[in-house]
A protein has these predicted regions:
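Conserved small/polar residues in nucleotide/adenosyl-binding loops
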Residues: 197-203
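A short acidic (Asp/Glu
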Residues: 43-44, 74-77, 185
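Alpha-helix N-cap and loop-to-helix initiation/capping positions
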Residues: 44-47, 78-85
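N-terminal catalytic cores of NTP/NDP-binding nucleotidyl/phosphoryl-transfer enzymes
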Residues: 2-71, 172-176
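Helix-loop elements that line ligand-binding/catalytic pockets
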Residues: 206
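Flexible loop/turn segments at secondary-structure boundaries
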Residues: 38-40, 71-74, 114-116, 180
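Divalent-metal (Mg2+/Mn2+/Ca2+)-assisted nucleotide/phosphate chemistry catalytic cores
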Residues: 81-196
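Alpha-helix C-cap/termination motif
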Residues: 55-58, 97, 200
Length: 206
């Protein structure tokens, strides 16, 4: 285990046994993490990348989502400014921290239509009441902000599309404050018998 595990900074998980089994048997598995391009990199980002590096050292491929659409929707950061912040404040530092460029994909939500389409289709499995209860949306919340969590669901699921590596376990290291979103994503996927290109999202019975 990494120092983050041994010191108790990583203290919760779901289905980690599936990931560890993949690593031990040299089977494919991946990591999906992201960044909001609206400010400077901080210690929390560093700990997430240290986790990603640890998984990568055990065979994982890493996908890094630049949440430029979410930054635009929730914080009013233009796509051009978000791109500049991401490249100067985050991506360059991630490379300096030692992520293997041959096993790392960095992408922008705004330029990966598969993510947007997945978010749209998976959005049929939730509703405004549920999103409002989780995220506190109210009548004056702009609709781009409401859509942002569904784009994040697309971020998490899309590495399992054939063109991005196919079906395999995906680890999503997040802070405990993000757990409601992870639970939402798992719930949506578990009840979505939807074929998307060659990816069939599992139902609860599968």
């Amino acid at each position: 285990p990494s120092i983050l595990h041994t010191r108790g900074l990583v203290f919760a998980q779901r289905d980690m046994d599936v990931v560890l089994q993949a690593a031990r048997s040299n089977q494919p598995f991946g990591v999906l993490t992201g960044l909001m391009p609206s400010g400077r990199m901080h210690l929390g980002h560093t700990m997430v990348i240290e986790q990603a590096k640890w998984y990568q050292s055990h065979g994982a491929d890493v996908s890094v989502a630049v949440a430029d659409l979410e930054s635009l929707a929730t914080r009013g950061v233009s796509l051009d400014k978000g791109r500049k912040i991401a490249l100067e404040q985050y991506v360059s530092n991630y490379a300096a921290m030692g992520l293997d460029p041959d096993k790392t994909q960095v992408y922008f939500q705004s330029t990966r239509p598969e993510v947007q389409r997945l978010g749209f289709r998976l959005g049929r499995r939730t509703n405004l009441s549920e999103l409002g209860a989780i995220y506190g949306f109210e009548g004056d919340t702009n609709l781009a902000h409401v859509q942002a969590p569904l784009v994040q669901v697309g971020d998490i699921v899309h590495p399992m599309l054939d063109e991005y590596g196919g079906i395999r376990p995906i680890v999503v290291p997040v802070g405990v404050d993000q757990d409601p979103h992870i639970r939402l994503t798992r719930d949506i996927v578990s009840k979505t018998p939807v074929s998307y290109t060659h990816l069939t999202l599992p139902t609860k019975s599968s």
